[in-house]
């Protein structure tokens, strides 16, 4: 009974010997001290000796188990710390791998485009869709839809981007005083007020917002042309009577008169006559050239 603690300690030692082999000598030293203390106990009564030996054996075995588990946990923590230090280098080092890592992010979705559409990322470097950044993708990546899937329609549409300025712009238009306006300038007068208020609310303007604005202006120009030709039986030259175009004519005339030292009225007549020569009976969509985002100053 006196060696019960020593025997129980050997049982636990055999079970976990593989996990703490580096700590054999310290554990053996502790074991020797505990068994020597147990062997030194002597009692006159057999019952007292059995009770005391059982208590000491349980106590010694508990100390042995706790010490072994503590050292095993320290050993595992040191191993995990070594693994973390070995893998401390970032995983995504190249731009392609960085794009893949961003694409896997659930919070911020990234829209990757095929190699044939890399000009979108170059010309529209600030383009966002629903808060996600548009990036280029390497052609060697697998599991990406083929380019034929983009042939049904445009890859990106400006109409899909909602503008928060529309509600505030409509409220500002209702507060404006009503004035008698001409027949041909009414349409462009309202739109010019709306565009001025919208352009002043967001600076600098991103390419996506500018694209949508230009698309709307082209559609409005088509509508104005159809209304003038069908309902009023007028020629396309009457579109020059609108306030939107005449304002630009005045600005051009003023600039030319300052540069050439000529009368403003004469320069205005020259500009209008030149525009009338360029007007044709057919209308076509102009070629739009949008500057880079870095060139726009707030």
From Swiss-Prot:
GO terms for cellular component: cytosol; endolysosome membrane; nucleoplasm. Innate immune adapter that mediates the recruitment and activation of IRF5 downstream of endolysosomal toll-like receptors TLR7, TLR8 and TLR9. Following recruitment to endolysosome by SLC15A4 downstream of TLR7, TLR8 and TLR9, specifically recruits IRF5 transcription factor via its pLxIS motif, leading to IRF5 activation and subsequent expression of type I interferons. Plays a role in the regulation of endolysosomal pH in immune cells such as B-cells, dendritic cells and monocytes. The gene is Tasl. InterPro entries: TASL. It is found in: Lysosome membrane; Endosome membrane; Nucleus; Cytoplasm. GO terms for biological process: innate immune response; positive regulation of innate immune response; positive regulation of toll-like receptor 7 signaling pathway; positive regulation of toll-like receptor 8 signaling pathway; regulation of lysosomal lumen pH; regulation of toll-like receptor signaling pathway. The modification Phosphoserine is found at residue 291. The phosphorylated pLxIS motif constitutes an IRF5-binding motif, leading to recruitment of the transcription factor IRF5 to induce type-I interferons and other cytokines. This is TLR adapter interacting with SLC15A4 on the lysosome. A motif (pLxIS motif) lies at residues 287-291. It comes from Mus musculus.
């Amino acid at each position: 009974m006196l060696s019960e603690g020593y025997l129980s300690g050997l049982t636990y030692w055999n079970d976990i010997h593989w996990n703490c082999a580096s700590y054999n000598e310290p554990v053996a030293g502790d074991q020797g001290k505990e068994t020597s203390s147990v062997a030194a106990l002597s009692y006159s009564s057999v019952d007292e000796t059995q009770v005391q030996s059982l208590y000491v054996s349980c106590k010694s075995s508990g100390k042995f188990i706790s010490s072994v588990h503590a050292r095993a946990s320290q050993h595992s923590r040191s191993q995990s710390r070594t693994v973390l230090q070995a893998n401390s280098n970032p995983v995504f080092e190249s731009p392609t791998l960085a794009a893949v890592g961003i694409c896997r992010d659930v919070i911020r979705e990234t829209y990757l485009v095929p190699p044939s559409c890399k000009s979108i990322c170059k010309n529209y470097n600030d383009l966002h869709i629903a808060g996600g950044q548009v990036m280029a993708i390497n052609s060697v990546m697998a599991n990406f839809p083929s380019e034929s899937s983009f042939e049904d329609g445009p890859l990106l549409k400006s109409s899909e981007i909602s503008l928060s300025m529309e509600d505030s712009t409509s409220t500002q238009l209702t507060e404006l005083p009503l004035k008698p306006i001409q027949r041909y300038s009414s349409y462009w007068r309202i739109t010019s007020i709306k565009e001025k208020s919208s352009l002043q609310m967001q600076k600098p303007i991103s390419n996506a917002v500018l694209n949508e604005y230009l698309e709307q202006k082209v559609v409005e120009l088509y509508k104005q042309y159809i209304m003038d030709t069908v309902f009023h039986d007028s020629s396309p030259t009457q579109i020059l009577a609108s306030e939107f175009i005449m304002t630009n004519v005045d600005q051009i005339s003023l600039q030319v008169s300052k540069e050439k030292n000529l009368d403003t009225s004469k320069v205005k007549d020259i500009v209008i006559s030149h525009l009338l020569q360029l007007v044709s009976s057919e209308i076509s969509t102009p070629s739009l050239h949008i500057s880079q985002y870095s060139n726009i100053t707030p």
